[in-house]
């Protein structure tokens, strides 16, 4: 069983009212293939950029309950995140680490519908979430070497992508850039909006065992992120998404994911994560709920999968 240890007082147990980008539209009915969960401890994940290090037969991914439903349109390179778009049945995706500041809108099979340019550079975009008012929050906080000092969340509306508000932040417990290799847990590829805050989930490059959770306000400004909790996650988290009813958090990692259930945000952050293997899927980077029980997953190689939870 995977434990969770809080390093600050837990947040009050309020009911979730979030629509983290995870809250996706109902574009297809859930398919009927069963889900198979892993029965053993997950393997350690590889470092980003080693695309071939986890290449497996697609049949193995299908055995784990994944259904390959499509391929991202050519030209959409190294999809790094996924988020429901305002238009039903469509999703936003984007590249990372110095690519053009382009956001693509695709359908549930990965085919491009349209695209727009965001009015801010792509230092290392890694995640995208939204609030109930239609604001989107792009996490420009990829930090492979734990040495960046220009971390930001980019707030925008798709109808006016040239107008970007910057939520600049720093971590309260980082004093060296970079820190010692054993302390490099300041890379962040997963974030989501909830109740006026943008929550950040780190990717532990040091021990691949601890996901630190921070929060910053959802308004533009300069902030020191608030340390919220530490989650024992034996993998490197690549995306985060919240179910439409707000009672289930999914943390995606490399060829695996972790599910945390609860009746409140505080309960979710104290829940024991349930591990699901995605072995054979490739470098899984983006996740968004298609409906309450179906997850859409994209890989850096461009594959699009569905998974019943």
Located regions from the model:
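Sec-dependent N-terminal signal peptides
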Residues: 2-26
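Sequence/structural signature of beta-propeller domains
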Residues: 22-24, 28-309
